[in-house]
Amino acid sequence: MNPFFFGNSKQPLYGVYHPPRAHTARPTAVVLCYPLWQEYMRAHRAFRQLAILLSKAGFSVLRFDYFGTGDSAGESDAGDVSRWTHDIATAIDELKDTAGVTKVSLVGLRVGASLAAAVAAERKDLDRIVLWDPVVAGKPYVEKMVLTEQADAGARRDATLGTIGIKGFPLTSRMRQGLEHIDLRDLTAPASGRMIMTVSDERAEFVAFRDAMAGRRIGLTYRHIPSAGNWDEIDQFGSALLPQSIIQGIVACLTDAEVA
């Protein structure tokens, strides 16, 4: 693993590069797109393991923090959906230069999957876009976070304006507006690459997205791999999720070890 900073020197992004550990490097590389806030914390260990397994399979892998998150530059209230999608594009270009490849696959979890799907509509250098338990509709996603926070705080308050705290992380009005506009059912087809949705359980929102893509004749491979997927839960111990079956399934998908 090689930690480093990249992108704009005045607002650098923090990344960890995993070089290929197999004898022969693959011709494509992989960018991992994290979820946000408490889901980031729950997923960090899983992403690290996924990156290691992919590097052992011969991929160059980059996992990174969006602007205003983790160890990247920016205050925690400075980012928004537009900036985070731009960060993914920056990470793609950085990995292509670092690994010397022309094609990159994206693996995104939760909001990271939603952002990856948006980026894919604009890129012609993608091989696969793996949407792992994606946030299909942003409005109910945000509403659930806000209601849960209100319940935990033991009081109701107007959260329609300004910045509120979500598990210790700021949710600004700009962030909220961007997240609420997410609706993968209206997704523009990827400009390149194959789109794959890998889900831990068959929630109604996942099935609705699959059916919407089928109705619009947008290619989507749908895989249900039963495993833990309660990313939005967090306890006082900061427990991580490490769903081995779905991690192995994503590796198999990217290495063509699964039958399409």
Q: What are these regions, as identified by a protein language model?
A:
Residues 107-117, 133:
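Gly/Ala-rich beta-loop-alpha elbow adjacent to hydrolase catalytic centers
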Residues 118-122:
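Active-site signature of alpha/beta-hydrolase-fold catalytic machinery across serine-
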Residues 7-10, 19-65, 94:
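Short, surface-exposed "cap/lid" segments of acyl-processing enzymes
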Residues 1-24, 219, 234:
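An N-terminal hydrophobic leader/cap segment in hydrolases
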Residues 123-256, 260:
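The alpha/beta-hydrolase serine catalytic core
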Residues 69-103:
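Catalytic nucleophile-loop/oxyanion-hole region of alpha/beta-hydrolase
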Residues 36, 60-70, 135, 226-228:
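Short beta-to-alpha linker loops that shape the active-site pocket of alpha/beta-hydrolase fold enzymes
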Residues 46-47, 75-80, 236-240:
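Short glycine-enriched, charge-decorated loop/helix-capping segments at active-site entrances
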